[in-house]
């Protein structure tokens, strides 16, 4: 066989394989996502009548926008820097390794648990975890619920 006939036979074989591959993909056996979406779009509009097209419309978006009223944010009150520093000390001790020293500080300042929690929340130095730490350790440290008022 000559080399030219071999090349012709190989060319015909390549064309045949390519034709079979395209025929299989056209049948939907190995269809890509782009071809699937194109096929879906073309079949979805085939069964639509003129009456159905009349009812298909978009609402204008500018008419249905709601105006949201934003409440005015109150200006934060100026806080006493001395008290803020004291609250920061409570916070640092509470979240350190010696967290139970807070109860000694409470005793020395004669603060109840509720007063301490209110004090720390006003100065933004406590979170839910800190409140849990305080209330769990309260039982072992005998912090009074209220100190007696001197008359």
Swiss-Prot record:
Which residue positions does the secretion signal occupy?
1-19
- What are the UniProt keywords, alphabetically? Host nucleus, Secreted, Signal, Virulence
Q: Report one GO cellular component.
A: host cell nucleus
| Domain remarks in the Swiss-Prot or TrEMBL record | The RxLR-dEER motif acts to carry the protein into the host cell cytoplasm through binding to cell surface phosphatidylinositol-3-phosphate.
Q: Which purpose does this protein serve, as stated in its record? A: Effector that acts as a broad suppressor of cell death to interrupt plant immunity. Inhibits cell death induced by cell death-inducing proteins, including the PAMP elicitor INF1 from P.infestans.
Which protein, by its recorded name, is this? Secreted RxLR effector protein 30
**Entry's family note:** Belongs to the RxLR effector family.
What does the UniProt induction comment state?
Expression is up-regulated at the earlier infection stages.
Protein species of origin: Plasmopara viticola
- In which broad location class does this protein mainly occur, judging by the first location in its UniProt entry? secreted
Question: Keyword Signal on this protein?
Answer: yes
Work out whether the entry's keyword set contains Signal.
yes
Q: Where in the cell is it found?
A: Secreted; Host nucleus
Motif window: RxLR-dEER: 38-53
């Amino acid at each position: 066989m000559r080399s030219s006939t071999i090349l012709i036979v190989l060319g015909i074989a390549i064309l045949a394989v390519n034709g079979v591959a395209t025929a299989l993909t056209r049948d939907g056996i190995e269809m890509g996502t782009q071809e699937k979406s194109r096929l879906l779009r073309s079949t979805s509009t085939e069964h639509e009548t003129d009456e159905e097209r009349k009812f298909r419309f978009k609402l204008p978006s500018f008419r249905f926008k709601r105006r949201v009223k934003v409440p005015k944010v109150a200006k934060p009150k100026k806080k006493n820097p001395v008290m803020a520093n004291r609250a920061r000390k409570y916070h640092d001790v509470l979240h350190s390794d010696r967290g139970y020293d807070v109860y000694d500080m409470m005793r020395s300042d004669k603060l109840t648990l509720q007063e301490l929690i209110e004090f720390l929340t006003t100065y933004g130095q406590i979170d839910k975890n800190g409140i849990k730490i305080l209330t769990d350790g309260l039982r072992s440290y005998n912090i009074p619920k209220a100190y007696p008022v001197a008359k």
